[in-house]
Amino acid sequence: NWKCNLSKADIAELVSAFNAAPPIDAAHVQVVVAPPAVYLDSTRQALRADFDTSAQNAWISKGGAFTGELDAAMVKDVGAEWVILGHSERRHIAQLKESDHTIAMKAAYALQHASLGVIYCIGELLEERESGQTIAVCERQLQALSDAISDWSDVVIAYEPVWAIGTGKVATPEQAEQVHEAVRAWLANNVSPQVAASTRILYGGSVSPANCESLAKQPNIDGFLVGGASMKPTFLEIVDSYKATLAEAV
């Protein structure tokens, strides 16, 4: 997730590095790049086909008189496969403050009318963790999505403790695993055991080449939502580390 960063020249340089990397092994690993919307089309055209691309946001419904918004069908039209929805910055930045309901509406439209995969972000603020509300907050955010959709086959959940995003603070592998395990249990109890088993749950929050291996070894962590570290060629070290962890588990 490149967020609101990078110039056209920066992206060209980064894409060149990604294109020079060994094959992704897409049968076992997916790598999804989410550039700023203005660069989504050109990034999709420039990247190798074994990289997927994603928008960072989309509107709640079909396009129309919604200045500045992005119809999920437009994302699909330029060849992108995914959209990130509910990122903590969309939920909590004062000028945005997207509600659980709004995010769920966006997800439902993207899934049902644009056939995009949705990376649905959940996570707690520091004060919510300190008051013991982590699981309750995540379950509330999951319930909003469950109320809006019935087919979870194209949903990936990303748990991102807000206090760890861009701060250099990382949830310990044990802290992250505890939440991931609770998310999977919630899915089993409130959606279905099949959805719980098949849904990938990513961890996001200051993921780096230095800490990704210990996180990836946790049984319920199925990958990462990477921010700052994805804007450097060394992002490929995270990909390689995750692939190596998968190979060790076989």
UniProtKB/Swiss-Prot annotation:
The active site is at 87 (electrophile), 160 (proton acceptor). Transmembrane segments: none annotated. It is found in: Cytoplasm. Signal peptide: none annotated. One of its GO terms (biological process) is glycolytic process. The keyword Mitochondrion does not apply. GO terms for cellular component: cytosol. Belongs to the triosephosphate isomerase family. Homodimer. This is Triosephosphate isomerase, cytosolic. It comes from Gracilaria gracilis (Red alga).
